[in-house]
Amino acid sequence: MDVKNSPSSLNSPVSYNCGQSILPLEPGPIYLPSSYVESRHEYSAVTFYSPAVMNYSIPNNSEDGPGRQTTSPNVLWPTPGHLSPLAIHCQPSVLYAEPQKSPWRETRSLEHTLPVNRETLKRKASGSSCASPATSPSSKRDAHFCAVCSDYASGYHYGVWSCEGCKAFFKRSIQGHNDYICPATNQCTIDKNRRKSCQACRLRKCYEVGMVKCGSRRERCGYRIVRRQRNSDEQLHCLSKTKRNGGPMTRVKELLLSALSPEQLVLTLLEAEPPHVLISRPSTPFTEASMMMSLTKLADKELVHMISWAKKIPGFVELSLYDQVRLLESCWLEVLMVGLMWRSIDHPGKLIFAPDLILDRDEGKCVEGILEIFDMLLATTSRFRELKLQHKEYLCVKAMILLNSSMYPSATAPQEADSGRKLTHLLNAVTDALVWVIAKSGMSSQQQSMRLANLLMLLSHVRHASNKGMEHLLNMKCKNVVPVYDLLLEMLNAHTLRGNKSLVTGSERNLVEDSESKEGSQKPQAQ
């Protein structure tokens, strides 16, 4: 019996073993519809989760010949309504079986059913990014791309559409103890061709696009997802019951914060990280006015993102507005400086204020009094470099600087006293997270205690550099060397009048609200 392809079929011939035919056909040529050629499968005796099925591969067309026989003895032609195991695995919604139709009366294409068609898989296997002429517009619309590197996605993994490479990379990262460090400025481009160049930036982008542990592994984490949903429902029921009874909400919110494990808290701090801010570098050589103008503009932009970062820390917005404003006013320059030190940790002798504003020590000679501050920043950064500060440790240290910055007498009002208890509870949670990060390093107990002490002792050096920087900035403001506006001016005025303030003024109350409106206007300038 001769087998011929229909005019709409693929270019590669498809062989069929007539000895295995179960159809009572008369001898003579028959035409296979294109949908059957397109969706042919081999059913072998393997389980659904076997590597042969999960790692679905298309055989090379060069091996297809007239004499090629299938390796499975139970080959049947799939009906048009049949879905491959790959489609069932990738499809996020429920699939309903379509009524079976006569294959000889209607040839229906599967391009509208399969989320990833054969041409897409062929291009993915060969690594080619060029479009195939056989790809129809509907198949292009149905194809999904990796949210991390923009390559063709193989399925819905860990909560997002991703390719096999990024899925495997994220799996290795969350299962192992990999503390990646970016050799550059933590803003490497991650795409199909450069995704392997920087593991730290690739993992950061995985978290940015929303990849989470067990985000889409329904077949392995179904019980965990159901259990988490049940726990969430119980928490919501508890909250609603407390609201109806009019009882205090403080205890419930503290329980929700306590439910966060140190690992979950660190991941939340990672997701709350502000983006890098770009500032146009002035023409060289620097003058006192040009350098101070660049630094003050950069500080004003970073303040907007810093307030947004603080509000993303679990439990911070539950504090009273008085405590929120006091904490931000007390530590804003320390937070900016420790971020500067982290960006400069891999660049000895340089200060990475921004990706496009990198200064050497000697460039600070043009500004009176700033060279001493540069030396303090470089010395503290060198000490962090000697300790080999890890990214997760940096996240916890920065949060501790914010939460431990208030040095005022305890308030007597019940509301303020309750906020103080929340602040202490939150600071303890961040401290536990730092201890957990250090314990993951595999060091002995004595070495862990010594490392924790060394990191905490460096916070006093950061505070000292911050005080020097504040004095210098106020001096430049008084001399009218550079104009100061917006949030930076608000922070400087608060620092000047801090000793005379006993209540939260109207300008302080508007500090957080003004930052939200300004954040929306400055988002296009941040990377």
Curated annotation (Swiss-Prot):
InterPro entries: ER-beta-like_N, ER-beta/gamma, Est_rcpt/est-rel_rcp, NHR-like_dom_sf, Nucl_hrmn_rcpt_lig-bd, Nuclear_hormone_rcpt_NR3, Nuclear_hrmn_rcpt, Znf_hrmn_rcpt. It is found in: Nucleus. Phosphorylation at Ser-84 and Ser-102 recruits NCOA1. Pfam families: ERbeta_N, Hormone_recep, zf-C4. One of its GO terms (molecular function) is nuclear receptor activity. Keywords: Activator, DNA-binding, Lipid-binding, Metal-binding, Nucleus, Phosphoprotein, Receptor, Steroid-binding, Transcription, Transcription regulation, Zinc, Zinc-finger. Residues 261-495 form the NR LBD domain. SUPFAM superfamilies: Glucocorticoid receptor-like (DNA-binding domain), Nuclear receptor ligand-binding domain. GO terms for biological process: cellular response to estradiol stimulus; estrogen receptor signaling pathway; negative regulation of transcription by RNA polymerase II; positive regulation of DNA-templated transcription; regulation of transcription by RNA polymerase II. The keyword DNA repair does not apply. The keyword Nucleotide-binding does not apply. Belongs to the nuclear hormone receptor family. NR3 subfamily. This is Estrogen receptor beta.
